[in-house]
Amino acid sequence: AGVLALAMLTACDGGTTDPDKIMPEDGTVEVVMKINNTAANKGLGQVEYSAKYSEVTRKLLVNWLEWHTNGNQNTKYREEYEKITAELGNVKIVVGLTKDTAPLAAQTNYNPATRASFKYDSIFADPSTYELAEKVGVAFVTTSDGTVYQAVCLFDVN
């Protein structure tokens, strides 16, 4: 039964055994498909899911939620942002919660946002920036009141 379960798990993501490419079944697959389908319709390249960069995206989403719910403390947000992104080295976030994106601007773009109000348009607002990305990080965080927030970040890893 364990072999069958493993076969089913790897079949869902094209047969990969690379742990960085295996997508959780929490809506991530649908998000990545929507991004890549929209990109294809716009004549843009595809991005590849990354568990590693999804964890960075999750930490950034938690940091943004702290800002959002605890009085919009920009200095604290920025300090935590720098800590989280320090581990990226030369990798840059080019879409989503970028270094230059103020938390309020992110809120206005609806990325991050509640899962229901998330706007995919923000990902493609600047096609030249989108084209810099090779990897995508997807994160969902459920708040204490049960609201699910979603964030998507695109990463330039080359």
Regions found by a protein language model. Give the residues of each.
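A well-ordered secondary-structure block
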Residues: 80-158
